[in-house]
């Protein structure tokens, strides 16, 4: 690929396929004439339709997608795939209609057929877990690059084809977009791709039609209980990735009971990994040295196999993330010695992960990190890592998502108060919630945990970061947790431009530290 990355992640040279073949293959009902109708793509939103697309109308929270069939037809859609109710809504658009009981459940197989991704030659890695998914995906991508392999990725932060990046909107794309992306990667000669797989993606059929060569599991902790009523339900969604129709092999981090439970219930062969001393896991990772800039570690496997390297990231948890990436590569057929030689040549893993323990400061003043961590476990891991390598104070800035899991807020506040010397609570993405209500829950958790802790409530994130910076000096650390790579703040139905990274750099320059 030359020039800028495409705005649409689709193959440049799609092959038209007769829609009648799809109907016959899947035994679907038809309303209208399919004679001569050929499809080159599929779209789940009328705004994403391109000429030649099959428009897929599914029931939504507020409206049925089939109600927008006329707009899809105007954009160039050649047919509609929907359910019975949707067929009635789409009739006036004048397009042939293919009917199935559950169009979302059919979407992965349909998109795979349209884009011919069932015969994809690339090695596919799928990574799931509460924390660390994005990091492992980027570490896989980085190590593959150091091995000379043209790689791709899709993550919460961005989609990558080779060296070209496009901003993401979902952790895992809808099946229509994901299969189109894989087809484009095939055109670009991508030999391996790492895909971040959320629990919601598994529950909502976004990765249907894909068989991963290796699935990886990082951990499971409190999150998304607005989508899943209890932790066992959340776990069950993750477990779906470790089924024979999803993946050939798995690598599971067993540092928690959830990891052990996953090994017991997995229906594919799994290899285990642990950072716990004395563990009987197949692979064991041991931290050799931690600094604010890097973490050196040793990875020991079956038969005495050993690799020592480093990752340019803070914390033992990132050593575990890197180890998971390496073991996933080994399980897919890459040679451990070849991996070790490439990493030794380059002085360790050469990875940049946007918004994940990303250092923004220079050589003077406090050290400033921005991190996407937004769960109690992520807060705990990052603060513990900082405390081990920080001589001075830790000042933490954070908020919480509105209209998301409210049950974790008090615990987030408590962990921040226990782990930091000063805490600044601000607004993150309030969405339709009252921001003051969100801040109050975080403050209550912090006050109850450590009543004497220095707490500041500063609604505006720009002012909040500058407040944190005013509390820190040489030898101190400022951790801005939550915004990560994002360049907006979502409030009352609007996405307001705001990059915490850019603003932090500006504030550091204003203070004369950058």
Swiss-Prot record:
Primary localisation category: cytoplasm
The keyword Transmembrane helix belongs to this UniProt entry's keyword annotation: no
EC identifiers of the protein: 6.3.2.-
PTM (free text): Carboxylation is probably crucial for Mg(2+) binding and, consequently, for the gamma-phosphate positioning of ATP.
Keyword Cell division: yes
Location(s), subcellular: Cytoplasm
GO MF annotations in UniProt: acid-amino acid ligase activity; ATP binding; magnesium ion binding
Pathway(s): Cell wall biogenesis; peptidoglycan biosynthesis
GO biological process, alphabetically ordered: cell division; cell wall organization; peptidoglycan biosynthetic process; regulation of cell shape
Pfam families associated with the record: Mur_ligase (PF01225), Mur_ligase_C (PF02875), Mur_ligase_M (PF08245)
An example Gene Ontology CC term for this record: cytoplasm
Residues that hold UDP-N-acetyl-alpha-D-muramoyl-L-alanyl-D-glutamate according to the record: 44, 46, 171-172, 198, 206
Disulfide bridge positions per record: none
PTM-bearing positions, type N6-carboxylysine: 238
Keyword terms: ATP-binding, Cell cycle, Cell division, Cell shape, Cell wall biogenesis/degradation, Cytoplasm, Ligase, Nucleotide-binding, Peptidoglycan synthesis
Residues given in the record as ATP binding sites: 129-135
InterPro entries in the cross-refs: Mur-like_cat_sf, Mur_ligase_C, Mur_ligase_C_dom_sf, Mur_ligase_cen, Mur_ligase_N, MurE/MurF_N, UDP-N-AcMur-Glu-dNH2Pim_ligase
Family: Belongs to the MurCDEF family. MurE subfamily.
Function: Catalyzes the addition of an amino acid to the nucleotide precursor UDP-N-acetylmuramoyl-L-alanyl-D-glutamate (UMAG) in the biosynthesis of bacterial cell-wall peptidoglycan.
Database matches in PANTHER family: MUR LIGASE FAMILY MEMBER, UDP-N-ACETYLMURAMOYL-L-ALANYL-D-GLUTAMATE--2,6-DIAMINOPIMELATE LIGASE MURE HOMOLOG, CHLOROPLASTIC
Protein name, as recorded: UDP-N-acetylmuramyl-tripeptide synthetase
Species of provenance: Leifsonia xyli subsp. xyli (strain CTCB07)
Taxonomic placement: Bacteria, Bacillati, Actinomycetota, Actinomycetes, Micrococcales
